[in-house]
C-alpha cells in the first residue's frame, strides 16, 4: 500500500475514541480528509461507515486507498507501521512496545468499563461500587504514568506516544462524570501526575485542534440529553391512544 494513496478518516465529534487517530495523523503529518459521522442516536449511519465497518458499525474508521481499518488503537498502530518515518508512536524497544499495548488495552477494558458502570448506575449501591472501581483504575494508571514517563512529561517520555494517545479517550468522559457528579476522580492528592499530564497533553499542537474543552464537552452532553428527551417525548405522543 503506497503512502501517497488517499487517506480518509470517518469520525464523530461525540466519540471519545475518534481523537486517537486524529492525533496520530497530525503527529505523522499525514494529509487526510475528515468525514464527520452523525451521532449514533441522532441520525442514520452513513453508507460509507456501514460498508467500511460492517461488523461494529462504529467510528472511527480509517480508509487508506481501498482498505478500511477499524478500531481506534488498531488504526494508530497501522499509521505508525504504514508511515514508519519519525516521529514513532509506538516504542522501538520490544518490551516497552508490548507494555504500552497492554496498558492501552487496560484503559479500554477496565477504565471505560468502570466509567460506563458509573454513568449507568441505577442506585446508590451500584454508584458507590463503580466509583470505587474507577478510582482504583485511575490510581493504577497514575502509577503506570510515573513508571513509563521516567520523570518526563508524557507516558512516552519527552514526546507523545502510543499510551498518551490511548489515554486521550478518557479525558472527555472523566470530565463529564466529574461535572455531573459530586466526585472528583483526578485530583492532586491521588493522581498528581495525571493532572499535569492532562494539561500538557491538551496544550500540545497535535491535540489542541481536536480535543474539546471540559466546558464544550459538558455543553454537548447537556444538548444530547435535551435532544434525547425531545425525541422520547415525541415518540410517546405519537404512540399514545390519542393519536
UniProtKB/Swiss-Prot annotation:
Keyword flag Nucleus: no
GO BP: glutathione metabolic process; toxin catabolic process
Binding-site residues for glutathione, renumbered to this chain: 15-16, 44-45, 58-59, 71-72
Keywords noted in UniProt: Cytoplasm, Detoxification, Phosphoprotein, Transferase
Record-listed E.C. numbers: 2.5.1.18
Phosphothreonine modified-residue sites: 159
Main location class: cytoplasm
Domain (GST N-terminal) ranges: 5-87
Catalytic activity of the protein: RX + glutathione = an S-substituted glutathione + a halide anion + H(+)
UniProt feature coiled coil, ranges: none
Compartments, as annotated in UniProt: Cytoplasm, Cytosol
Domain GST C-terminal as annotated: residue spans: 93-220
One GO MF term attached to the UniProt entry: glutathione transferase activity
Pfam families noted in UniProt: GST_N
One cellular component (GO) term of this entry: cytoplasm
PANTHER family cross-referenced by the UniProt entry: GLUTATHIONE S-TRANSFERASE U13-RELATED (PTHR11260:SF632), GLUTATHIONE S-TRANSFERASE, GST, SUPERFAMILY, GST DOMAIN CONTAINING (PTHR11260)
Annotated family: Belongs to the GST superfamily. Tau family.
Function: May be involved in the conjugation of reduced glutathione to a wide number of exogenous and endogenous hydrophobic electrophiles and have a detoxification role against certain herbicides.
Name this protein carries in UniProt: Glutathione S-transferase U14
Species for this entry: Arabidopsis thaliana (Mouse-ear cress)
Lineage: Eukaryota, Viridiplantae, Streptophyta, Embryophyta, Tracheophyta
Amino acid at each position: 500500500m503506497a503512502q501517497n494513496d488517499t487517506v480518509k478518516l470517518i469520525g464523530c465529534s461525540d466519540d471519545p475514541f475518534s481523537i486517537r487517530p486524529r492525533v496520530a495523523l497530525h503527529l505523522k503529518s499525514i494529509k487526510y480528509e475528515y468525514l464527520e459521522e452523525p451521532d449514533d442516536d441522532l441520525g442514520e449511519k452513513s453508507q460509507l461507515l456501514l460498508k467500511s465497518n460492517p461488523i461494529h458499525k462504529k467510528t472511527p474508521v480509517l480508509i487508506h486507498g481501498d482498505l478500511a481499518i477499524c478500531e481506534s488503537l488498531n488504526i494508530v498502530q497501522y499509521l505508525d507501521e504504514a508511515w514508519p518515518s519519525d516521529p514513532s508512536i509506538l516504542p522501538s524497544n520490544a518490551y516497552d512496545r508490548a507494555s504500552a499495548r497492554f496498558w492501552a488495552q487496560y484503559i479500554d477494558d477496565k477504565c471505560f468499563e468502570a466509567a460506563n458502570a458509573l454513568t449507568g448506575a441505577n442506585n446508590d449501591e451500584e454508584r458507590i461500587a463503580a466509583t470505587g472501581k474507577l478510582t482504583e483504575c485511575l490510581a493504577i494508571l497514575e502509577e503506570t504514568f510515573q513508571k513509563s514517563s521516567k520523570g518526563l512529561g508524557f507516558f512516552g517520555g519527552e514526546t507523545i506516544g502510543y499510551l498518551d494517545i490511548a489515554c486521550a479517550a478518557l479525558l472527555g468522559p472523566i470530565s463529564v462524570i466529574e461535572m455531573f457528579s459530586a466526585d472528583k476522580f483526578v485530583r492532586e492528592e491521588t493522581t498528581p501526575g495525571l493532572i499535569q499530564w492532562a494539561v500538557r497533553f491538551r496544550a500540545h499542537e497535535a491535540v489542541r485542534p481536536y480535543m474539546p474543552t471540559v466546558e464544550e464537552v459538558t455543553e454537548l452532553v447537556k444538548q444530547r440529553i435535551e435532544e434525547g428527551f425531545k425525541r422520547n417525548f415525541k415518540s410517546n405522543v405519537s404512540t399514545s391512544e390519542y393519536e
